[in-house]
Regions:
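Gly/Pro-rich hinge or "lid" segments in bacterial periplasmic/extracellular proteins
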Residues: 1-38, 160, 164
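Short, well-ordered beta-strand elements
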Residues: 7-10, 20-21, 36-42, 176-185, ...
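A bilobed periplasmic-binding-protein/Venus flytrap-type ligand-binding module shared by bacterial periplasmic
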Residues: 23-27, 87-110, 114, 123
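Ligand-site clamp/hinge motif
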Residues: 26-72
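Short helices/loops that flank or line small-molecule/ion binding pockets
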Residues: 48-59, 76-77, 105-106, 194-203, ...
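Ligand-binding "clamshell"
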Residues: 71-84, 224-226, 240-255
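Extracytoplasmic/peripheral linker and loop segments enriched in polar/acidic and small residues
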Residues: 106, 121-122, 155-157, 206-223, ...
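Structural transition elements
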Residues: 130-168, 186-191
Length: 266
């Protein structure tokens, strides 16, 4: 079949796992103002490899996540080439709502409270991100969000409340909760998963086993619901809250947290 598009470019070549080549479309309505004639996209899983190929001149531009250990160094060495811009995206860990014991709201809430977002954002990643208290970014156009009470608590108070909830759910220091944390192959995702597992252990005594999968297998695992907690991320298709909220509808193909709420659906 033929792919039908209405953008400034058309598909010229596609080699799976190697490259996607787009060329300027002469039938695009604003073709006179299209500046670039051809664009080649390269799928690069490693952020370090991405940077190395950029600095060698092989890549003209990258919008990938910067390697944690190289970001500050690159900002000093090539400040005019490293840009940090606001993004309507949320990086998060999704909890399998249908799999015991994660179908217990106390367990899910404890994991939420026990994650020190300030350390992840400001110490581990340190690339200008904002700590998130919800799925939809507060600067989304039209969003009128109320910051939850717990977001104003100290991390110590969050940890105390999380431990109480875990104890109510049957998990203590003698019988700790053990979870599998799934992430797809990436230098950044691995480092963040290691940090997250360390924080959950230190803050609320949860044992975390890291599970790495390649992208296709990772997606299948999430859709099938055979995971505990998984790395996830979502970027808005358009600047409006429903771009985030619609993914949590029970019939959404993007609802890999397997969240179900008749009230939310209605």
């Amino acid at each position: 079949g033929n792919i039908v598009t209405n953008g400034a470019y058309t598909l010229k070549d596609w080699v799976v796992n190697e490259r996607i080549v787009l060329e300027r479309s002469p039938t695009y309505w604003n073709n006179a103002k299209t500046v670039i004639n051809q664009v080649t996209y390269l799928p690069i899983a490693s952020e370090v490899t991405d940077v190395n190929r950029y600095r060698s001149g092989e890549i003209d531009m990258t919008y990938n996540n910067m390697p944690i250990e190289l970001f500050q160094k690159l900002k000093k060495e090539i400040p005019d080439e490293v840009h940090v811009d606001p993004y309507l995206c949320t990086y998060y860990y999704e909890i399998n709502n249908q799999k015991p014991p994660f179908n217990d709201v106390r367990v899910r809430t404890a994991l939420k409270l026990g994650m020190d977002r300030d350390i992840i954002v400001n110490k581990v990643k340190a690339q200008g991100d904002m700590p998130a208290y919800g799925y939809t970014p507060p600067y989304t156009d039209g969003a009128k969000l109320t910051q939850p009470e717990w977001f104003g608590w100290s991390q110590e108070k969050r940890n105390e409340e999380a431990k109480k909830l875990l104890a109510e759910a049957g998990y203590t220091a003698d019988k700790p909760l053990t979870i599998n944390l799934l992430y797809n192959t990436s230098d950044l995702h691995k480092k963040l998963a290691i940090a997250a597992s360390s924080l959950w252990k230190k803050n609320i005594g949860v044992n975390v086993k890291l599970v790495n999968q390649e992208w296709k297998t990772f997606l299948d695992t999430r859709h099938q619901g055979t995971f505990d907690v998984a790395r996830a991320g979502w970027c808005a298709d358009y600047n409006e809250p429903t771009s985030f909220l619609n993914t949590m509808l029970s019939n959404s193909s993007m609802n890999t947290a397997h969240y179900k709420s008749p009230a939310f659906d209605s």
